Structures are given as structure tokens and as C-alpha cells.
Regions:
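Patatin-like phospholipase
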Residues: 1-49, 57-274
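Single conserved hydrophobic/aromatic residue that forms the stacking wall/gate
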Residues: 272-283
Length: 283
């Protein structure tokens, strides 16, 4: 079974990124990653959930984080979703999957330049599914598929929804195979005010769940980055992608500069990088 967690790989990786869910705030992942790369903290493997899977797949496909913004420029939320008569979700993700297919060079996870593990929730069996091979667009869509808002995604006769329901910050996914894990959590806070409508109430309720299951994962990371000032963004404000990117970039630079002053030896250890196993195989 593809979602099984046993024996994915026997490789060891120097540094892994674990990227949380967070909907529109996922653009802060790209900013945080840009800052990390500029400090020479490069991942050999990425684990992503929902918005983190989306950010991770574009980087693993060979794109610099700041360049990914170009793919979304000029798009609105409604360009990537399709409003449907509510049956199992308000929107379906066919346009989103087409967008991924049009803008990614790789079509399958195993074709990416960097190993990427995408986490979704198996709706039929109530368990986590960790995808490391197969069609990219289907698996990213499955991981992003927040119940009620989006219709579940069917893969090989099984329905999947947002991985954040069970694990919104996927550190455990790669913890045992990485020397160091950098976790980026872009959904640590919630706005104090919210609208009383079906979408707003559903999203706020999910956020309580996401925060709760992220607490144990936060403790497992070697470096935790939680960009601030993200709680005021609406999940449909795609036009603010660059602004959200800069929030992640600036917050991460602040954290890294502080660590360089305070941590010394620990920081030098984290900065150690080595080629990924796929790089070694290609040489």
C-alpha cells in the first residue's frame, strides 16, 4: 500500500525541512526557505503537509523559493478552485491540479530533484498516508484538501483529505532519517476576530486541531521557525502572496541572526550539509 510507512527508504540525510499546513500562509514557507538557503542551510529531503507540500514540491522541482511567486502572480483563489453544488465539499480542485501539471517539470514524486514526502489523511481508514511516489498533482491536492471546503481526493480507490487533521507539522515523518530537522510552522496563531459563516467557522475549528497536534511535533525539531504576524491574512488573499513571503523571510532572518550570536557550536553543527543520496546516485 502506497500510504504505508514501513521501509520507505534506508538513506540517511543531513538536513530535512518539515513544512506545516497553513493555507494561504504557506507562502511564508517560501520566504523562510529563501532565508535558510541564503544562510547555507540546504535540505536533503523535505516533508510537507497541505500548504507545506505545495511549497515543498515547487522547491523540490528545482525552483528557487522567491521564483515560485511568479507562478501565482495574477491568479486569484477562484482561478485554482471550482465552486460546486455542495455534496461533499464547497469546491473541487481540478483547476488546482491542472495548475500544478502546467507548472511543474516533474509529474511523479520520484522524478523530483529532491526527495519529498507528502502527508495526507486517509479518510476511509482514519490514518496518516505518507506519499513518496506517484502522481504529484493528485497527492498535493489530497494533502491540501480541507474537509467541507474541498471535496475529498480519490487515489487508488481510497479517499484522502488534508494531512493536517492528524499531523499538521510533519517532523516525525523524517525525524528518524535526518541528522537535523528544521521545522517551519506557519500556523501557530489565529486571529482573535472571525466571521460567523460556514467557511470561517470551519477553518477556525480546524485551526484548533492543527495547533493541538503540532505541539508534540514542535519538540522534535532541531530548529523551529514560526513566522509572526500571519494571523491577519484571509485564506483567499492570494494577491498578498509576496507580502506573506516577506513575513516568512524576515522572521527567519531574525531567528537565524539571533542563533548565530547565541548558539555557537550547536549552530555550526546545524550548518553542516552533505549531498543528498540522489545527488550521489547521479554523480
Amino acid at each position: 500500500m502506497e500510504g504505508a510507512t514501513n521501509n520507505w527508504f534506508s538513506n540517511k540525510y543531513s538536513i530535512g525541512y518539515a513544512l506545516s499546513g497553513g493555507f494561504i500562509k504557506g507562502f511564508a514557507h517560501l520566504g523562510a526557505m529563501q532565508a535558510l538557503l541564503e544562510h547555507d542551510i540546504k535540505p536533503n529531503i523535505i516533508s510537507g503537509v497541505s500548504a507545506g507540500a505545495l511549497a515543498g514540491v515547487f522547491y523540490a522541482d528545482g525552483n528557487e523559493p522567491h521564483k515560485v511567486l511568479d507562478y501565482f502572480a495574477g491568479h486569484k483563489f477562484q482561478d485554482l478552485t471550482k465552486l460546486v453544488i455542495p455534496k461533499v465539499g464547497l469546491f473541487e480542485l481540478s483547476e488546482f491540479k491542472d495548475f500544478l501539471k502546467s507548472n511543474l517539470k516533474a509529474k511523479k514524486l520520484e522524478e523530483l530533484q529532491l526527495p519529498l514526502i507528502i502527508t495526507a489523511t486517509d479518510l476511509d481508514h482514519g490514518r496518516l498516508a505518507h506519499f513518496h511516489k506517484g502522481d504529484i498533482a493528485e497527492r498535493v491536492a489530497a494533502s491540501c484538501c480541507m474537509p467541507v471546503l474541498f471535496a475529498p481526493v480519490k487515489i487508488d480507490e481510497t479517499y484522502y483529505v488534508d494531512g493536517g487533521l492528524l499531523m499538521n507539522l510533519p517532523v516525525s515523518t523524517i525525524r528518524r532519517v535526518c541528522e537535523k530537522v528544521v521545522a517551519i510552522n506557519v500556523s501557530p496563531l489565529m486571529a482573535p476576530k472571525y466571521k460567523m459563516n460556514i467557511v470561517s467557522v470551519a477553518l477556525r475549528s480546524y485551526n484548533f486541531m492543527f495547533r493541538s497536534n503540532s505541539f508534540p511535533e514542535r519538540e522534535k525539531a532541531d530548529l523551529l521557525i514560526e513566522p509572526y504576524n500571519l494571523d491577519g491574512y484571509s485564506n483567499r488573499e492570494l494577491e498578498k502572496a509576496e507580502e506573506i513571503f516577506m513575513q516568512g523571510y524576515n522572521a527567519t532572518n531574525d531567528i537565524l541572526e539571533r542563533l548565530q550570536i547565541e548558539k555557537g557550536t550547536i549552530w555550526n553543527c546545524l550548518l553542516y550539509t552533505s549531498p543528498s543520496p540522489r545527488d550521489t546516485e547521479r554523480s
